């Protein structure tokens, strides 16, 4: 058995699910260890993957929050008990606060631990676990200290490798195949900033819009809907990205990897570095440097959208060159080497 852990948000959960799917396809039994209250608590019951949820205290960027310390300790102890019972041959942690207890428990029990980092810099959980791990898989090349660099390998970001013909995808979503479609994503929880500031900018632009506002914001922003403008709490990402001609979003690693897989150029509004330590800004700059994305500017966003629509083919090619296709298989190969 191979145990996978990580989550809390979609950026950590979805790559682990993609690897789980690949491992199951190869005949390996898998088990998923997630966090109580994380996104996985809602999504895992809808999958065929056996799973358990444990407490997982949130890590702070400067020091462990006193009120979270008991949860962190409890989570590690619960994870240890579970791993002793399941006896997995290897553990993959995709990070996030949900991935720390299982990763630490694997290290304490001497079970081979493989980490996967999604962003253009190591996250807190992976930073803490990396010295203890047997392997470190990266989505993009990172500058690392020599001890970590020796066990690191760039594999890409695992995504659901599903595509649909563009015209078919637009029709399935109820859009005109002959008109460009702008897909707006604010991350798995939605972005209030994008939800509030974007609609006035889009008035009069020659685009259809599929706007994922986040489930908690659906009723508030439902009145935005009209001809060629759809509001959804959650979207089928492979279908939506297959249909879209241009993406406007935050700069989470998962969203960008999926956009690259679909060759979907993007206009990006990364989170403030005060909120995520600069991970999204680093992601956005990497994709912009490659030519597949630009950093959005509210004072000229209308022009940026029009410029992107006029230059779609070149930007599509640049984005597609960053495709993570095969990443789930490469991670599965690394895990099999531990068995």
Curated annotation (Swiss-Prot):
User: For binding UDP-N-acetyl-alpha-D-glucosamine, which residues are annotated in this chain's numbering?
Assistant: 9-11, 119, 160, 188, 280
Task: Give membrane topology per the record.
Answer: Peripheral membrane protein
Query: Which GO annotations describe the biological process of this protein?
Result: carbohydrate metabolic process; cell division; cell wall organization; lipid glycosylation; peptidoglycan biosynthetic process; regulation of cell shape
State the reactions this protein catalyses. di-trans,octa-cis-undecaprenyl diphospho-N-acetyl-alpha-D-muramoyl-L-alanyl-D-glutamyl-meso-2,6-diaminopimeloyl-D-alanyl-D-alanine + UDP-N-acetyl-alpha-D-glucosamine = di-trans,octa-cis-undecaprenyl diphospho-[N-acetyl-alpha-D-glucosaminyl-(1->4)]-N-acetyl-alpha-D-muramoyl-L-alanyl-D-glutamyl-meso-2,6-diaminopimeloyl-D-alanyl-D-alanine + UDP + H(+)
Its name, as the record gives it, is: UDP-N-acetylglucosamine--N-acetylmuramyl-(pentapeptide) pyrophosphoryl-undecaprenol N-acetylglucosamine transferase
State the function annotated in the UniProt record: Cell wall formation. Catalyzes the transfer of a GlcNAc subunit on undecaprenyl-pyrophosphoryl-MurNAc-pentapeptide (lipid intermediate I) to form undecaprenyl-pyrophosphoryl-MurNAc-(pentapeptide)GlcNAc (lipid intermediate II).
Keyword terms, alphabetized: Cell cycle, Cell division, Cell inner membrane, Cell membrane, Cell shape, Cell wall biogenesis/degradation, Glycosyltransferase, Membrane, Peptidoglycan synthesis, Transferase
Q: Which family does it belong to?
A: Belongs to the glycosyltransferase 28 family. MurG subfamily.
Q: EC number(s) in its UniProt entry?
A: 2.4.1.227
SUPFAM superfamilies named among the record's database cross-references: UDP-Glycosyltransferase/glycogen phosphorylase
UniProt cross-references to InterPro entries, sorted A to Z:
GlcNAc_MurG, Glyco_trans_28_C, GlycoTrans_28_N
Q: Where in the cell is it found?
A: Cell inner membrane
Q: Which GO terms describe its molecular function?
A: UDP-N-acetyl-D-glucosamine:N-acetylmuramoyl-L-alanyl-D-glutamyl-meso-2,6-diaminopimelyl-D-alanyl-D-alanine-diphosphoundecaprenol 4-beta-N-acetylglucosaminlytransferase activity; undecaprenyldiphospho-muramoylpentapeptide beta-N-acetylglucosaminyltransferase activity
How is this protein annotated for GO cellular component? plasma membrane
Write out the pathway annotation from the protein's UniProt entry.
Answer: Cell wall biogenesis; peptidoglycan biosynthesis
